[in-house]
């Protein structure tokens, strides 16, 4: 887990990419806890929670854009699976929303909470395959 804290370079895009990865990991964990809490107490996703999920998606997209900038500058991840984890990070929340009842039922809280938990795993794998 020390790779979560290590910064070994002076490239601004790379520093941003690593920082956004950590932010995405933490934020997705918070979204998982919040969604599962809503499910446990029997409530559908609140407007605030749905808005927070949009921010999580925005962070995933921003991470992807910075990753593309890095690629154009000649940087490459340690493992090519890193690209797959990036795509999965971007499509997971829209997929969960597509499977849901548009955020109106208690079950949707479960879907979004589990999607957040899944994204924690995706973020950890993305960090692991990007570092080298």
Name what the model sees in each region.
Residues 19-27, 76-89:
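Structural signature of hydrophobic alpha-helical transmembrane segments
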Residues 44-60, 81:
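Loop-to-helix transition at the N-terminal end of transmembrane alpha-helices
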Residues 2-29:
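Hydrophobic transmembrane alpha-helical segments in integral membrane proteins
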Residues 64-67, 90-101:
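Transmembrane alpha-helical segments of integral membrane proteins
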Residues 24-42:
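N-terminal signal-anchor/start-transfer transmembrane helix
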Residues 121-132:
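Juxtamembrane boundary at the C-terminal end of a transmembrane helix
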Residues 40-50, 100-108:
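Membrane-interface helix-boundary motifs at transmembrane edges
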Residues 56-70:
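A generic, lipid-embedded transmembrane alpha helix
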């Amino acid at each position: 887990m020390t790779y979560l804290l290590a910064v070994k370079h002076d490239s601004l895009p790379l520093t941003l990419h690593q920082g956004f990865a950590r932010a995405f990991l933490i934020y997705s964990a918070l979204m998982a806890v919040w969604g599962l809490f809503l499910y446990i107490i029997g409530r559908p996703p609140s407007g605030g929670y749905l808005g927070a999920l949009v921010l999580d998606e925005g962070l995933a997209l921003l991470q992807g854009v910075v990753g593309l900038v890095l690629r154009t500058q000649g940087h490459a991840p340690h493992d090519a699976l890193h690209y797959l984890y990036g795509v999965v990070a971007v499509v997971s929340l829209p997929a969960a929303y597509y499977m849901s009842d548009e955020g109106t039922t208690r079950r949707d809280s479960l879907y979004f909470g589990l999607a957040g938990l899944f994204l924690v795993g995706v973020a950890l794998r993305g960090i692991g395959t990007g570092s080298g």
